[in-house]
């Protein structure tokens, strides 16, 4: 019995050395990140930004939907009103140390102001540096969604066209015709 355990231990050692020897010549799985670029998925959700419209004005109307839908409550903002009765965020703050990058804020935003881009370098030395203010989040461009203006489409009358006559609308359904 002792001799059997001895041969089993020797076989285990030889097998370990053999596996190590074989894997020396195989392709390395680890990537050296800064030198080798990462290939990210097209649906990757990274850093959060606030975008502007095509006229250079910020898109955010401070509706608060992003703050409400966030499961970890990492978004806080305060609404203020301009002279022309349009809302804007007086402050907009995201705590990225709490953010789970789920993308629900991007889906809830009616103006497409908040967007998640494919930036992976988000590390900081202090936790306080992971709290981003509006000036840190606001970019000069339009982000992923070009030529979209919320005020151009919301609440604008089409003119003489009835509901369902435009090419991007479907005709309204009369629910009385669906009854048995």
Curated annotation (Swiss-Prot):
Enzyme Commission number: 7.1.1.-
Cellular component per GO, a single term: plasma membrane
UniProt-annotated location(s): Cell membrane
Membrane topology (UniProt): Peripheral membrane protein
A Pfam cross-reference name: Fer4_7
Signal peptide residue numbers: none
Cofactor(s) this protein cannot do without: [4Fe-4S] cluster
Binding site for [4Fe-4S] cluster 2: 70, 99, 102, 105
UniProt keyword annotations, A-Z: 4Fe-4S, Cell membrane, Iron, Iron-sulfur, Membrane, Metal-binding, NAD, Quinone, Repeat, Translocase, Ubiquinone
Domain (4Fe-4S ferredoxin-type) ranges: 51-80, 90-119
Membrane-traversing stretches: none
Comment on bound cofactor: Binds 2 [4Fe-4S] clusters per subunit.
Binding-site residues for [4Fe-4S] cluster 1, renumbered to this chain: 60, 63, 66, 109
Record-level GO BP terms: aerobic respiration
GO MF entry, a single one: 4 iron, 4 sulfur cluster binding
Family listed: Belongs to the complex I 23 kDa subunit family.
Family matches, as HAMAP family: NDH1_NuoI
Subunit text: NDH-1 is composed of 13 different subunits. Subunits NuoA, H, J, K, L, M, N constitute the membrane sector of the complex.
Function per UniProt: NDH-1 shuttles electrons from NADH, via FMN and iron-sulfur (Fe-S) centers, to quinones in the respiratory chain. The immediate electron acceptor for the enzyme in this species is believed to be ubiquinone. Couples the redox reaction to proton translocation (for every two electrons transferred, four hydrogen ions are translocated across the cytoplasmic membrane), and thus conserves the redox energy in a proton gradient.
Protein name: NADH-quinone oxidoreductase subunit I
